[in-house]
Structures are given as C-alpha cells and as structure tokens.
Amino acid sequence: MRVTGRVLFVLIAALTSLGAMSLQRAEQPASDKEIRIGNVMPYSGPLSEFGAIGQAEAAYFDMINARGGINGRKIRFITRDDNSDPATALELTRNLVETENVDLMFGSFGTPGNLATRWYLNEKKIPQLFVASGDEELSQPGAFPWTMGWQPSFRSEGRIYANYIQAYYPRKKIVVLWQNDQFGRMLYKGIQEGLGDLNRLVRVDIAFDIADQHLDGHISILKRSGADIFVFLGVPSTAAKVIKLAASMNWHPVFIVNDASASIANAMAPAGLENSAGVISAAFLKDPSDPAWKDDPAMKDWFAFMDKYHQVESTNNSAAVYGYAAAEALAQVLKQCGDDVSRENIMRQAASLKNHHPSVALPDIRMNTSPHSYLPIRQMRLVQFDGRSWQPFGEVIETAFTEGAAR
C-alpha cells in the first residue's frame, strides 16, 4: 500500500467479513476538506494488463492534490483489486461505500463487475461514474440513473468495422476471432448488426477464452477458410500473439482489431512491426507510443505527468492514457460542482457535459451528456497502422453510434 498526498492507493485481493454499516444518504454532502472516490480494478488475474488504468487514475489525483485539489478539496482515491471477479467486485464496492464512506464510485473496470454492482449503487443512490466498459447496459439513465459509461459503446464500434468492410470489401470472405465474454460478444454483435444480410460472408467465427492455449489451432482453422478479412476482438496481449501467428503461417489477410487492442507498444510491436503493417482499427484516444504525437502539446503534458507522478508505468501504455483521460473527465465534473459536491449534484453535473474535449483524445472527439444521454463519447476515427504510426482516414464517425444505440 502506498499513500501519496491525500490519495490512498490500496491493492487488496480479498476482504475479510464486512460488518453492517449505515450508509450515507444520497443528499449528504462530501467533507469540506476532501472528496472520497472508490474504484475497483483487475490488478491481478487474467485482465491485469488493464490495472494500468487505475494506477494512472491514482497518479492523476496525486497531481491534482499537489496542485491544491479541486475547489479547495483534496481527492482521496481508494482503489482495490477484484481479480476480475464480479462477486469480489460487489463485496469490495459495498466495503468502499459502507466502511470507507466514498462519495462516489468511479471508473471501475469491466462489464461483469459493473453489472454486479449497478443495482446496489443505484438502490443506495451512489454515483457509478465513467465505468471502464463500453457496454450500453451501463448507460441506461431511465432504468439506472446513477450509472454512467464513458468510452464509445462496443456495439457501435463493431458497427464501424462492419460499415468499413461493406464500403471497402463488399464481397470478401470474413472470419472473426472474438473473446468469449460480454466484451467480445457486444463487439461481435455490433459487427453482425452492421453487416446485416452480409453476415453470410462470415465463413467462421471462433470464441476464445482469455487464457486460451490453442490460438495456433484457431488461426489454422481460420486460415483454411480462405477468408480475405480477419477481425480480432480481444485484448492487446492476445492480439499480438494472433498477428504474429498469422504471419508465421504466411497468412496475410486484411486485419481489423478492436480499439482496446490498437496499441503500438502493447500489440503491434510485440507482434512485429512488419507483421502489423496494414492493421485497421478505430480509435478515440491518442496512442502514446505513436511517434506522430511526439510534438503534440497534450502528449508532452502526458509525458511530463508520467515522469513526475507515475514513474512505475511505461509512458507508452495505452491503458494508462485511458485512465488519465477518464480521471481528467471526472475532474471536470467535480470542478463544475463548485461548492455543492453532494451525490445528487455530482450526477447532475456528469449529465451536463457540453463539448468537453479530453486532452489526450483525438482531434474533434468531444464528450456530451444529458439527463437522457449517458454515453459521453459517441465518436471514433478509423486508423491504419503503417508499420510505424497510426494513419487516420475518413471523417470522425458518429452515424454508427446513432444507429447502434437504437433498440
């Protein structure tokens, strides 16, 4: 455990039994001296590579506190390890609310854990803000007014890839390798929705588990299908293995990977830059390992932040950039709260963002929310890796989000 300023960074794999504790009322204001923020992350287990999100958020609030806090209040950020287990996520969240008396939960990772805690937090009127998941079920203000997403939705992202395939490769054969969880399913569902009648061109789709030891067998099956387009939907470490395996089999289809895997440092470079050349993705944040941004003022601020407040993590980690951007967005919400940092006003301000541009987001990406719109980021850009850098093409995409959100 480390304590820096007023930020508490705690990594706990499991909790002992919890005593019954009285809950703060939703309208109860935060302390005059601090705002207490709870967070749950997979610092261990199969998705531990995304623990970098929470670590960057902790460091960001260290920086905020070093600069005097927000509206005179310091930030106390308490983050814990759920090992990607929904039951543990619920137990930890209850403890953060009932024992640590957090004012809100922020940025907890993953669809299963956030779905497991959603009912509890809404029942107790605790803000569940900017969850680290693109599942639209976590952005339903009518049913769950205390839960709000942050990143572009998985389904809409999937529709972007489907629209790209229809526009550039309308009669080509497709294969899909997708992660066998809610994350992978929603991405693939978006592709299926976007392809419509062209789903007949999907020759093979294979679901894989995060710890799958048979990737070579999967790639062999996909190659034998004779497909022209290979869509991968999963995490960066697996994307690197898949791209490298395909190249080793002398198979060079049009490669599409999802945004979470579109990291030069975490996926393209480990796969081999030559092997990764030509990979297509969609993005909304700048890749810190992309030399295209080396002179960008916002990325210079990012590197300075990492050097001063977060030296334990690589400056090239895209997951860390995600955490930085999400924490920056929460800081904007808290600034808008002024002196009223009650839970109700925190939600009110979170639902009142107008054209907020995260500093490390791609140009023209904006956050907008309202009481009826809990998907803050509804824009992405198509990008292609040229062996060195991501090259954007086309315009900022919004139409897929309008269509993808329809139910």
Residue positions per predicted region:
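Segments of small-molecule ligand-sensing domains
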Residues: 308-321, 331-392
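Beta-alpha junction/loop-to-helix N-cap segments that form part of ligand/metal-binding clefts
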Residues: 28-30, 34, 49-55, 67-140, ...
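Extracellular/periplasmic periplasmic-binding protein-like sensory domains
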Residues: 246-322, 396-403
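Extracytoplasmic "Venus flytrap"
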Residues: 30, 34-58, 80-87, 109-110, ...
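Extracellular/periplasmic Venus flytrap/periplasmic-binding protein
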Residues: 91, 136-139, 145-251, 292-295
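Periplasmic-binding protein-like
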Residues: 96-109, 129-131, 173-178, 226-236, ...
